[in-house]
Amino acid sequence: MQQYSSKYNKQAILLVNLGTPDNYDTKSIKRYLKEFLSDPRVIEANPILWKIILNLIILPIRAKKNIHTYKTVWNKQHNKSPLLFYTENLADKLDKKLDNYIVDYAMRYGNPSIESKIKSLQDQGATEIIIFPLYPQYSATTTATVYDEVYRVLSKLRWQPTIKGINPYYDNKFHIQTISQQIKEHLKKLDSTPDTVLFSFHGLPKEYFDKGDPYYCHCYKTYRLVKEELQNEYPNIDFELSFQSRFGPKKWLEPYTTVKLEEFAKQNKSVVIIAPGFSADCLETLEELAISEKENFIKKGGKEFSLIPCLNDSNQHVDMLYNIIDEEICLKK
């Protein structure tokens, strides 16, 4: 009987994040936004009408508008967006921690693509690939579309690898403990105790939730579990929930982060804000929260504004992902 090389019996873990433009020029941003906003999971609209609106109105305007915002947060030392930089480092660190697995990363939109990385992992001998979407809270607009793309890629392969997936980890004990500890460590660094810790999650059109998307419930449970971990130790801090990054005229999940921050500002409160739905810092945290929302908050009378960084490529994040993977698939030691 023919002996096959042991090369073709490896397991791999593919971390998947949202995506980023290749650069902060108009062409790169437009290409990225077109792929992202053309996904029917993201924008539920008449496809013909939406294509016209997207190409004639939204892309020309938003591509130019976003040049400055991307340039503001871009990691110019490595010529990468923060999201790409941190996700790449995170995969490298996890790869070093997992001797018996190949660990790599991909982006749902932009580069490196899921298709290119599945091919790369197969070329390295992976016959089983564990997909790990880096979204703690499930949504059809994020987690589901990752698997849509994975299975689209598989449909073209003659030799398909076995695919397994890591569940959303919005209520996983390792995730809750890590976020709670992250907040504690940040609070210790402050000169005074803030009035409020605001949990700001990326928003979602309310109609998506009404149709059955569990995202709001997952966000609320993450918020509630972390709050329960902290409220006894910090009885004088209010813990609140909000949603950011609203896009378009439709009603989105409420309360809106902008509205909550303006309310706190009018009361001359000090605020610490954390965005636990983002695994790595990106435009929504480094520009929208750290710059735009902070400026508006201070302008409206807010006292102190402090943003907790995402877990990024920290050792705590690596350990958390390791423990979640181990809990789900019993890692080979």
Curated annotation (Swiss-Prot):
InterPro entries: Ferrochelatase (IPR001015), Ferrochelatase_AS (IPR019772), Ferrochelatase_C (IPR033644), Ferrochelatase_N (IPR033659). GO terms for biological process: heme biosynthetic process. Pfam families: Ferrochelatase. Its EC number is 4.98.1.1. It is an enzyme of class 4 (lyase). It catalyses: heme b + 2 H(+) = protoporphyrin IX + Fe(2+). Fe cation binds at H202, E284. Keywords: Cytoplasm, Heme biosynthesis, Iron, Lyase, Metal-binding, Porphyrin biosynthesis. It is found in: Cytoplasm. One of its GO terms (cellular component) is cytoplasm. Pathway: Porphyrin-containing compound metabolism; protoheme biosynthesis; protoheme from protoporphyrin-IX: step 1/1. One of its GO terms (molecular function) is metal ion binding. Catalyzes the ferrous insertion into protoporphyrin IX. HAMAP family: Ferrochelatase. This is Ferrochelatase. The lineage of its organism: Bacteria, Pseudomonadati, Pseudomonadota, Gammaproteobacteria, Thiotrichales. The gene is hemH.
